[in-house]
Amino acid sequence: NLSPEEIESFSVLKDATATAVYGVKGANGVILIQTKRGQIGKPRIQIKADYGFSAPTMLPEFVDGAKYMEVMNVASQFSSGKDMYTQAAINATRNGTDPDLYPNVNWLKAVTKDYVPSGRVSLDINGGSERLRYSLILAYYGEKGMTVTDPGVEYDASNKLSRYNIRTNLDMNLTPSTEINVSLGGYILNQRTPGYTTSSDENPRTPFTDIIKLAFKNTPIVHPVIYSNGQIPANTSQTNPWAAATHSGFISSYISSLQSVFAVTQDIGKLWHPLKLSLIHI
């Protein structure tokens, strides 16, 4: 949950190098991130703002209801020698004359948006002198999720994420050989997801994953998204993906984290060149 504006550089430790420093937790490698620190010079203030849109890059193409019925008829002919659906039902599904009785639904399109907006704003203040250098970064990132909403419902159950970051680094030279470093960083994360979920400790999943899974499983002719009289269809064997996305309430979570690092570095090169001793408290 770092903001990109906080990152100065990063490096990767692998194999024995990682395990020597971080033990078994570093067995798969460790990414070390160096955050931005103050540079000597006049105060520099930089403001950035980005706004864009996100969209799925690749989605599967599903057959429509009429084609599904024709394919099922072919399969039924092999197994029982009979058609599962009449030609009149297939024609009615293709023509869409009575969507309540002969639905033809692309469930993936019914529960997802074509694109969603996202935005990022940051404030970067950097500067300092030989004695004191400082860096302050404030950042905000927000994005809306891909699940649809129902305007007739009082609440908005679609995915949403908002994150606020703060990072400040101070470097102070008490003496020509003594340096104090203070780093403070954290974030507040607010995330909202649809309330429908089948997640468990043994099989953890996100609500979005569950809803997309429903959209993949449901047949295009099981029932319409919503009946023309406004009632929501229900089926004992197939959950309505649209209802799961829009009428199952929502889950809102707040996560906050604050990290601090205090270090004192003493240059004792006059006693043993070159050598520096550092005391770090995290």
Model-assigned labels for residue ranges:
Residues 271-274:
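Short helix-terminating capping/connector loops at secondary-structure junctions
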Residues 280-282:
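Conserved small/polar residues in nucleotide/adenosyl-binding loops
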Residues 257-259:
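Short, solvent-exposed loop/turn segments enriched in Ser/Thr/Gly
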Residues 1-5, 11, 17-254, 263, ...:
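Membrane-proximal, glycine/serine-rich, low-complexity loop/turn segments characteristic
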